């Protein structure tokens, strides 16, 4: 045919010759030669290596070489006594661009139509029949050394795919796939599976299979490939990809698990990996392997010791029994597939069937991501996972899905469960709850905890109401028909509250409504009845959650639990009852408050005398009007608190820069006083990465007094708290899911990313090739070069010297008290972009105010005269000529001696914004509509705006005292 003619050429003698296959070139990260020295070899191995090299040379697989590349070569002896040559290509693989897998997973033999005859072949030395591209051969050179260097070493290079090369499997798959493509096109009604160098052919009849195989032989030979004649299988049982295939059944090949080699985490990890690979055939539910999975917990070091427990030994025995007896079925290509979901213990189990024939099992992982995973959510996840598996196997959705739910429960799941909606998205088949009658599923251990039976989502009528509370001092309590205080060993308010809820569920054997001020405990109690509880390294937490689940499931009466916000001062019986529960656990706090009101003892003394936390003790002192201190500012609504000096307060966050690849996690820290930024790019955002970043910050910025972060796991872990404690650093977090509390660092993230984009798209910094180099250049620009609005120095200068050079520091200011809706006078401590920190007065805490709630203070004329006589200001006599006023100049103008027109700008049509007298709002003075024209006597002139020389003529008339603040509107 035409395709055959294209592949053949006619020589000058007239004989047909096979055109050599076209090699697939490799892509290299560098052309710089990689040379790894050959290590010495014992004489016996050296002789074997010479023999093997000569054999490969005769076959044309290698050739002599003078390449600047070199990889070590060695030999190993097989059980048969024969030697095998191997090349250590790790260094070369590191500079090869990976091609990626073409078959990410094994094909399932269950998709082979039942009763179809098979032929299975194995390609002989497949890698050695596929040529390397000519330009790539020199990269795979090796050296055979000489003993005592008594003669020159012999050097060769591979001409075919070497064993151990990174892309050899992918090139092999591509090469063999090209050879089989004409076979697939001509025999499209045959079922052909190809994996690496193993090929399976199935056809409806033997004659068609023989025709297909004959054509396949020719195509394989034309491609330069050879079939291993001793590995052709034509009769049952067939062995393919670890499975034993019969006419209708498929069984795993018989193996025995060696238990004496199971010593370390790595040993068990490999064992469970192998078992998981054949579990879809064995049908071992997740609950039946829980003890084996539990061995993987603990130390993550691969060489850490592990012990095979008696329970895990029984589970291994079960696996061995299943290997001996388990089987699945080949499919009927004309019949649809169905998915059955069984409510088994621990997690649901899925089974793909055709009629009543088992095709494959499906399971969920033993470990979950969430602390509580509802059983209904697990069913939905398993449905979505298995639907994708069925589509991958046969290209179609299952015809029917059978679930352990009633029609009404399915309807409610579509309404209320997001996981259910995702798992069944775009499914157009049948959802049923009638299982086929067969004995193959009877061994499964079922659970009845699919949907909640005891927990209610709405308040119960005619039921008792109980309020719970817990304290970090270890006390738990509840109030209601009766009161009870429980002493717990926990130093966590949430855990104490959890004990309170468990106690209520145990003490009240009747319908109850529970009200708690812990949202975390409420959500956990709502979900725990049907949830799979994720294992935690915290044994106390595991015990509490398991006890809570057992308590809920043992109840005979329903309950409802809801959340109430604590300390809201709202009217009503719910708030009052919750406060009563609070009082039961906070008696020590009340006594501490009483002692401080009497003696004003400091926070350390309160913590030493009473069972209160540091935060509670500090709050008592800070809320005392006699004990307030200047360096503990309160937070005004709408403003992020800043530090009042370098390293007083940092904000820290993790942002993502996708262009950095593996190092896309960029940890960012900003000093809220100086706005000095430091960032490091890392491979993750766990606690270890955060600590690594902070140590880098300490080396550059110093050690802070306080750090504020979000509520990410890396910042809330015990390891991170211990790290901060060692460095004597205070730590606070913002409100969960509310980024406004981290506004400074969030804005810094945006600034840093913008700078990176500027450098990448418009910079001339080709030497910055790595992510950290790009980051360092951006940080240098932002810290040492940029000067921001309202500042006269860089962030680095401010951070190192502690000087901000703000023109308004120390000046009087009007600030708006949003709580009382009044304007008060204060003194500016620091002034930044869009914010200021103001001291309201002596013995009062500073407040952070948005600049939109600030106005410049205008002192009475008497105070102005006194200040003019004591401060370095320039006295000026009244005159008709303009007075030159510079930025930040202060000029006291004496009163006039005659009557003139009201004050106005010399420039036509301009206006002056003037504050009159004391505690009055600013008014507009000038010719424009709406401006007043008051008479004036004296005023102090200041020009706070950045502008060139301002020339004004001031006309003096008798009247009230005022001071103008010049602002062009």
UniProtKB/Swiss-Prot annotation:
The RNase H type-1 domain extends over 460-590
Start and end residues of each Integrase-type zinc finger? 587-628
Note the Gene3D superfamilies from the entry.
Answer: 1.10.10.200, 3.30.70.270, HIV Type 1 Reverse Transcriptase, subunit A, domain 1 (3.10.10.10), Integrase, C-terminal domain superfamily, retroviral (2.30.30.10), Ribonuclease H-like superfamily/Ribonuclease H (3.30.420.10)
* InterPro entries for this protein: DNA/RNA_pol_sf, HERV-K_env, Integrase-like_N, Integrase_C_dom_sf_retrovir, Integrase_C_retrovir, Integrase_cat-core, Integrase_Zn-bd_dom_N, Rev_trsase/Diguanyl_cyclase
Keywords from UniProt, A to Z, are: DNA integration, DNA recombination, DNA-binding, Endonuclease, ERV, Hydrolase, Metal-binding, Multifunctional enzyme, Nuclease, Nucleotidyltransferase, RNA-directed DNA polymerase, Transferase, Transposable element, Zinc, Zinc-finger
Which residue ranges carry the DNA-binding annotation? 811-859
Q: Which domain of life is it from?
A: Eukaryota
| Transcription regulation is among the record's keywords | no
**Which residues does the record give as Zn(2+) binding sites?**
596, 600, 624, 627
Does the record carry Secreted as a key word?
no
State where Mg(2+) 1 binds. Answer: 469, 497, 517
Residue intervals of the Integrase catalytic domain? 642-803
Query: Where on this chain does Mg(2+) 2 bind?
Result: 469, 582
Explain the purpose of this protein.
Answer: Early post-infection, the reverse transcriptase converts the viral RNA genome into double-stranded viral DNA. The RNase H domain of the reverse transcriptase performs two functions. It degrades the RNA template and specifically removes the RNA primer from the RNA/DNA hybrid. Following nuclear import, the integrase catalyzes the insertion of the linear, double-stranded viral DNA into the host cell chromosome. Endogenous Pol proteins may have kept, lost or modified their original function during evolution.
Q: Which family does it belong to?
A: Belongs to the beta type-B retroviral polymerase family. HERV class-II K(HML-2) pol subfamily.
Anything further noted? Exact N-terminus of this protein has not been formally described. The 102 C-terminal amino acids differ from HERV-K(HML-2) Pol prototype due to a frameshift in position 867.
Q: What is this protein called?
A: Endogenous retrovirus group K member 11 Pol protein
Organism encoding this protein: Homo sapiens
